[in-house]
Amino acid sequence: VREYDVLIVGAGPAGMFAAHELAVLGNGKIKVGIIEKGYFAHQRKCPLQEPKVGKCTYCEPCHILYGVGGAGTLSSGLINLRPDVGGELHELVGSWEKAWELINYIDEVFLKFGAPPNTLHEPDPEKVREIEKKAARVGAKFVPIRQRHIGTDNSIKVIDNMTKFLMERGVDFIVGTTALDIDKVNGQFVVKTTKGEFRSKLLLLAPGRGGAEWFVKMARKLGVELEPGPLDVGVRVEVPASVMEEIISVEVDPKIIIYTKT
């Protein structure tokens, strides 16, 4: 049985940044372990993206969903730098000012680990105003966002650099390991996995979308109060490039909010 001060389940954005803060603020004196179902970023290879294969071979675990860096690592590496995109950070931390501080800090961390500095895109204010007016006329809202487009290849390098930084400060990465169950024994958490048991004084569960069902099950077992969040339902609408050209020229990955009657 391996023991830690803090155990983290899931090496996605939440788990990695939590480990980063513990490593930096604890100056390497806090014993941290991260249990991750997938593998290190450079080991994640999706057959769909391999020219010689080009199809899903049902890897277990899926390299897209699982692995160090989280589900977004093998996508385009696009980071939305705004508190109310992807969640309501300002509500969680209590103010817009604090939320912006955290957003800017996160961007600095990505740059520290090798994100190219010339990848930041800030939409032109004048063009944004024009699109906002057009959107308002049809009952929609255009949301301008600072975006950093790191790219897939750079994302893997950034995550690998961050992983190396954490390992040099004593953080253990327990990859290829699935967390199965959690018990609390004598004031310690006991995490049962496919590679044995791990114990810790503190436990952070950050299993991502892939582990959402398991997370709910464990939270209920441990008596953690849950608050359901809104459900995002996506609809794919394909249009000719000319239709979106004006908006795409201002925002690479535009966000438009439309409130319908039903």
What kind of feature is each model-predicted range?
Residues 1-86, 126-262:
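Residues forming the flavin
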Residues 67-121:
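Dinucleotide-binding Rossmann-like beta1-alpha1 core, especially the glycine-rich loop
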